[in-house]
Amino acid sequence: MRLSLRHITWLKIAIWLAATLPLLWLVLSINLGGLSADPAKDIQHFTGRMALKLLLATLLVSPLARYSKQPLLLRCRRLLGLWCFAWGTLHLLSYSILELGLSNIGLLGHELINRPYLTLGIISWLVLLALALTSTRWAQRKMGARWQKLHNWVYVVAILAPIHYLWSVKTLSPWPIIYAVMAALLLLLRYKLLLPRYKKFRQ
């Protein structure tokens, strides 16, 4: 079945629900005491995992659209990417405010230098910031070919973000490894899609 614009509208509504309902759940859990004895860590990990899930969903769009021959799916990619950035920003804020505290926010630079996993995290967020700021059609027209080069940096985030997660957890858990494997598979899939173009270019 060929997807129509109406289907894409419903998909975008589903994305909005999938991205906002977890935030509602988190707020309710905070207010109803549904978190652990270390709620700050719970919030940091929850927001970080949401950002990573949305990153993986964003990366999945292109190969899914190509293999299913549904080019309209690409219209969902920007929305997923913006929600990935939004949750990534919540993740950064949760660390800055809940872990360091507003009175010690100046220590953030020191923490970034002395904790390499934080360095990877802030690099990932800065790339997502650049991608979010240039996600409009206007920016795409103004930047021309440079726009695609910039947005290819999402694959750098796909490498750094799972490493950041693996490095940051203090207890043994399968989830960081699962996310890392999923990111690696998506990167491999993207490589296979780009390889024919590269060979054609070399010829």
From Swiss-Prot:
Cofactor(s), names only, from the UniProt record: FMN; heme b
Main location: membrane
Membrane association type: Multi-pass membrane protein
Cofactor note: Binds 1 FMN per subunit.
Keywords: Cell inner membrane, Cell membrane, Electron transport, Flavoprotein, FMN, Heme, Iron, Membrane, Metal-binding, Transmembrane, Transmembrane helix, Transport
Segments passing through the bilayer: 13-33, 79-99, 116-136, 147-167, 169-189
Example of a GO MF term: metal ion binding
Superkingdom per UniProt: Bacteria
Compartments, record wording: Cell inner membrane
A Gene Ontology biological process term: protein repair
A GO CC term assigned to this protein in UniProt: plasma membrane
Coiled coil: none
Pfam families cross-referenced by the UniProt entry: Ferric_reduct
Family matches, as InterPro entries: Fe3_Rdtase_TM_dom, MsrQ-like
Listed NCBIfam families: PRK05419.1-4 (NF003832)
Entries under HAMAP family matching the protein: MsrQ
Function: Part of the MsrPQ system that repairs oxidized periplasmic proteins containing methionine sulfoxide residues (Met-O), using respiratory chain electrons. Thus protects these proteins from oxidative-stress damage caused by reactive species of oxygen and chlorine generated by the host defense mechanisms. MsrPQ is essential for the maintenance of envelope integrity under bleach stress, rescuing a wide series of structurally unrelated periplasmic proteins from methionine oxidation.
Complexes and interactors: Heterodimer of a catalytic subunit (MsrP) and a heme-binding subunit (MsrQ).
PANTHER family xref list: PROTEIN-METHIONINE-SULFOXIDE REDUCTASE HEME-BINDING SUBUNIT MSRQ
Homology family: Belongs to the MsrQ family.
Name of the molecule in the record: Protein-methionine-sulfoxide reductase heme-binding subunit MsrQ
Organism: Yersinia pseudotuberculosis serotype O:1b (strain IP 31758)
Gene name of the record: msrQ
